[in-house]
């Protein structure tokens, strides 16, 4: 029995000596070395982990007599040792450790938080770690950014590359209440898919979580459809409606139809004012834009008319400028997933930002 106790004491003593050597090497030896940026970050993480162990286990791992905390620019580090909550100390190390190896899925390249384009929603959320250790908290504060294809998460809104990212088209999203047991359990949502790792987040409030989920669902719906949606009921109504019916809605004046087409401005043909039925006219060639003529179905396509919400100037040659209130015909939604549609205004054709438009007619 005495031999066992002796071995146990030797093991503990050896562990403490080894711990002290490791801490001395990281804090003192590496201090004078010319380390790369990644190595400096790793050293900071290790120093912070040593400090967390000292704070949480002062009897077994007391602070060295000559301990001093280094000044640094790492926002995750504490400026004093006066923190008493263990969860706070754990979160310091956790913030540095989580996603230590950046998680990139598919062909998503590294990108700075400020350089993401087509941002639809962004803000701070708490992300649940894939696995958490002795040093780690289960949740970490992350700057999250949603665009029309990818969900990114960063350590902060100033980070030069993401800690992780994934294509949202591979997932579904839902609000959940079983991820936490505290007062924020109703502020959680998750991305999930069969056979894939889930991604789980906590927002600042239930309302904020719902806003995230609603926005993500809108993007998922856009990704699943690249054509202009038309309900069956709307289609039936379009077959029965006449110009007089539409004009009764009180919307903007309707463009006169071309021969063989509907909903296009021009002077090559007009409907008989006394004829209340929709009739077909044999299609004939008519000049259009410089790109050539475009065919339309022989029925009204008022669902494809949108009105400008704000003035929009063209930054590129392929963009279509328009003013607030302009009536724009949407030719296609081929680039819907990028936030752009193809529109026509006064014979000019170009891409327009869909967020600057809203339906012109209530059908």
Curated annotation (Swiss-Prot):
Cystine pairs: none
Residue ranges of every copy of the PH domain listed in the record: 118-221
Biased composition (Acidic residues): 230-248
Modification note: Phosphorylated on tyrosines.
PROSITE patterns cross-referenced by the UniProt entry: PH_DOMAIN, SH3
GO terms under biological process: adaptive immune response
GO cellular component entries: cytoplasm; nucleus; plasma membrane
Subcellular location as annotated: Cytoplasm; Nucleus; Cell membrane
Stretches the record annotates as Disordered: 62-94, 227-273
Homology family: Belongs to the SKAP family.
Role summary: Positively regulates T-cell receptor signaling. Required for optimal conjugation between T-cells and antigen-presenting cells.
Name assigned to this protein: Src kinase-associated phosphoprotein 1
Organism: Takifugu rubripes (Japanese pufferfish)
Gene that encodes it: skap1
